[in-house]
Amino acid sequence: AYEIRPRDWSSDVCSSDLLNRVVSLFRQRGFAIDSLAIGRTHEAHISRITIVVDGSKTGVEQVVKQLYKIIEIRKVSDITDDQRVERELALVKVTSKSATSRAEIMQIVDIYRARVVDVALGSLTVEVTGPTDKIDSVVGLLRGYGIKEMVRTGVVAVTRGAGVAADSSKLHVVA
């Protein structure tokens, strides 16, 4: 029996144009990508791709072997079982037609330590950052007011402590 649960991958690559090849490897093997984020790192010309996928550990290990065959990929870390810090960002434009609804939305913003980044006639744009479950909770509460527009970044993660994911000889995947 295989354990099926979300897996978080962190891959440092030499150029962000590798995204298509990396995603294709997961897609070809039938993995559903729950979250994907790519961005620059502290090293010039290096980007990090963080992918959360649903799949068995065995299946994911097969993808890792294939990822290492892509010459531009420097390292792949499966940090599922490691202590880690994960964050996601969402921008949510919410309908706000009355002073009462604005006050209620502001209460939600305060409780979840989110912030309003834009105010317009009839709407507020809320920025919320944190773990995925926090984002889901805020979005769930704001749905009652009418979401006009929303965008989420996808999960980014780093391991806790002084080390980095690639320092260990074991394979790391985040769940």
Task: Indicate where each model-derived feature is located.
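Strongly charged, low-complexity linkers/loops
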Residues: 102-127
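Short, low-order "capping/linker" segments at domain edges
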Residues: 85-108, 129-143, 160-175
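Short amphipathic alpha-helices in soluble, non-transmembrane regions
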Residues: 22-26, 62-70, 104-110, 138-144
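Conserved short beta-strand edge segments in small beta-sheet-based binding/regulatory domains
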Residues: 36, 71-84, 114-120, 146-160
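Helix-adjacent hinge/juxtasegments
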Residues: 55-100
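Short, surface-exposed ligand-recognition loops at beta-strand->loop->(often short) alpha-helix junctions
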Residues: 10-18, 93-100
